[in-house]
A protein has these predicted regions:
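Active-site region of glycoside hydrolase catalytic domains
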Residues: 2-5, 112-237, 245-268, 289-295
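Acidic/histidine-rich helix-loop elements
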Residues: 17-30, 58-64, 102-114, 208-242, ...
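An active-site-proximal structural segment forming one wall of the substrate-binding cleft
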Residues: 27-29, 35-46, 61-92, 96-138, ...
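Short, solvent-exposed turn/loop segments enriched in Gly/Ser/Thr/Pro and often Arg
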Residues: 49-52, 90-96, 181-183, 295-304
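A generic structural signal for well-ordered alpha-helical segments
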Residues: 79, 83, 253-255, 287
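Aromatic-rich peripheral "rim/lid" segments of glycoside hydrolase catalytic domains that contact
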Residues: 272-334
Length: 334
């Protein structure tokens, strides 16, 4: 029997993405009760996807509205108060976002000016928060790079990461940095192992199951009714073994001394609930077997455990929350 490889460079953080400043159209207010609830139930990690447009003025990436940083300060302070590790992520940074609701004026992968502005923003964060230890705060540089070769190649990504890591380390050498894999976070980057920074995978495959009827994806209306096992992806029917093989590629990083975390996973609320839970348990078994922690996409909302508006769930009123009890218990189990 082959030895199971486990990552041991990061804690097995377990938690949620909280979407305070993720999109101009869908940011959430700061709710201290959410942090307390998450902590009280044994979770220890919050990923905060950020959109740089919140803190610039006049569409000028060098004109900074420092008042907005007070909200980020509050997020970090709540993390410290409730013993939750805070992972700050640029979901939109200068030159790139996987969310195409707004067209960036330049390309992070291709334009040096975009890269200069991008690293400048991370230097602002590095300077402002350099007194906060990495045990409490980490930086996740850019969310889910992807695109055609004329938008973002693997070589472009390596250039962006090396340049930005050096920029941050020049100010805060000890800061914990986590980078997403390429191709929407699904493919690891062993070529960056020498930087000794952690890497973040995703839990969204097969996409036909996790994003069934997702209203921002035109093709999602054409996906077959999900089932598990047996959901299709890339001309293959997925089951536990196919999923395991996918993450085996990731855990090879552990043998290179690289920490691994799953920064996002989840299932949109149109997938049948029993299918979502069955798939989710197989994912959590896979991740846990390698000591890889996780963060559900959304505490609240269509992927989350609170107010997810699933038509096939009877919600439990629990401590003032409308809880998807079965999904919540599944997360608690792992």
């Amino acid at each position: 029997m082959s030895k199971i490889i486990v990552q041991d460079k990061l804690p097995r953080w377990r938690g949620f993405n909280i979407l305070h400043m993720f999109s101009k159209s869908s940011n959430e207010p700061l709710r201290e009760d959410d942090y307390k609830f998450i902590s009280d139930h044994g979770f220890d990690f919050i990923r905060v996807p950020l959109n740089y447009l919140f803190w610039i003025l006049n569409n000028n990436p060098r004109d900074i509205n420092w008042d907005i940083f007070k909200k980020i300060d509050d997020i970090i302070n709540l993390g410290i108060k409730y013993k939750l590790h805070i992972n700050l992520n640029f979901h939109r940074g200068p030159g790139f976002s996987v969310n195409r609701e707004i067209q960036e004026p330049y390309s992070l992968g291709k334009d040096q000016k975009a890269l200069d502005d991008f690293s400048y923003h991370w230097q602002l964060f590095a300077e402002r928060y350099k007194q906060i230890p990495s045990k409490q705060l980490s930086f996740n540089l850019i969310n889910e790079t992807a695109g055609t070769p004329d938008e973002f190649t693997r070589e472009d990504y390596e250039k962006v990461i090396r340049f930005t890591v050096n920029s941050i380390k020049s100010i805060d050498p000890e800061r914990l940095i986590i980078i997403d894999g390429i191709n929407y976070g699904n493919i690891p980057c062993p070529e960056l192992a020498d930087l000794k920074i952690a890497q973040s995978c995703r839990g969204y495959l097969p996409i036909t199951l996790t994003h069934y009827k997702a209203n921002w994806m035109k093709e999602a209306e054409l996906y077959p009714i999900p089932k598990w096992p047996g959901a299709p992806h890339n001309e293959k029917l997925w089951d536990y073994e196919v999923m395991k093989n996918h993450y085996d590629d990731w855990v090879k990083l552990a043998d290179m001394g690289i920490g691994i975390h799953c920064g996002e996973f989840g299932v949109f609320n149109k997938t049948p609930h029993n299918v979502a839970l069955s798939w989710m348990e197989d994912l959590l078994i896979n991740l846990t077997s390698h000591n890889i922690g996780f963060a559900l996409w959304g505490f609240r909302g269509a992927f989350g455990i609170v107010d997810s508006n699933r038509s096939d769930v009877v919600y439990e009123k629990y401590l003032g929350y409308n809880i998807d009890r079965k999904m919540f218990d599944l997360l608690l189990k792992y």
